[in-house]
Regions:
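Nucleic-acid endonuclease domains
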Residues: 1-79, 83-211
Length: 211
């Protein structure tokens, strides 16, 4: 057994890799992905998809996702981005549409390179992106249609100042109390940039600060 138990070097896969048994091909990685990841409306996969959408918009989707990292996304500009997602519709039967709530709890950080956790509980990002799959017709729900998403962007310092120990926040409270910037997918780069620089864009910039 190798004495090296450090982190694996994860390389990005293409989906065409073979699944083998005794030298015989029994499937492909893409088959597994289709089997495991096709339900994009459940909480787990929707959350991962939301991270990917934000990373893609910010030019940070190169490489692979790190599970349980201290922040969800690190951009080429060195911005640290935390991504949260919510939706009115779920893949299971619902008596009513879900109430929209996002997790904002400070947390201890975990380092994948060392396998150790920090005892300090805090929010480590520069900015939060709250991703709302706002579509409300179950028959036409499609998480891959980015017109069905709305994004709210907020500097982390505002959460630290206004909600220092709060663990979750309703959409109504987020909008009314904290005034995040609201944008569509195309506007994410400018909106995140504005928030990381601690600025609100001037009127007519194409961004929509909520009142």
């Amino acid at each position: 057994m190798s004495a090296d138990l450090g982190p694996l070097a994860i390389t990005r896969r293409s989906s065409s890799e073979l699944i083998r048994a005794k030298g015989e091909t029994v499937g492909r990685l893409g088959d597994f992905w289709s089997w495991a990841c096709s339900d994009l409306a459940n909480n787990t996969m929707r959350g991962v998809l939301a991270e990917y959408l934000v990373a893609m918009a910010l030019g940070a989707a190169i490489g692979t996702r790190t599970e349980w990292d201290t922040v969800d996304i690190r951009t080429p500009e060195k911005w640290r981005v935390e991504v949260k997602s919510a939706a009115y519709l779920q893949s299971w039967a619902q008596p009513q549409m879900s109430k929209i709530e996002f997790g904002i709890a400070p947390a201890s950080g975990w380092d994948a390179q060392t396998g150790t956790a920090s005892v300090e509980v805090m929010r480590r990002s520069d900015v939060y992106v709250f991703c709302l799959l706002h579509h409300q017709d179950k028959q036409t729900l499609d998480p891959l249609n980015l017109d069905q998403w709305t994004f709210y962007v907020l500097p982390t310092r505002i959460l630290d100042e206004r909600c220092p120990t709060q663990r979750s926040i309703r959409l109504s409270s987020l909008v009314e109390r904290l005034s995040p910037l609201k944008t569509d997918f195309a506007g994410l780069p400018k909106t995140v940039s504005a928030c990381t620089e601690g600025m609100r864009q001037p009127e007519g910039s194409g961004l929509n600060p909520l009142q």
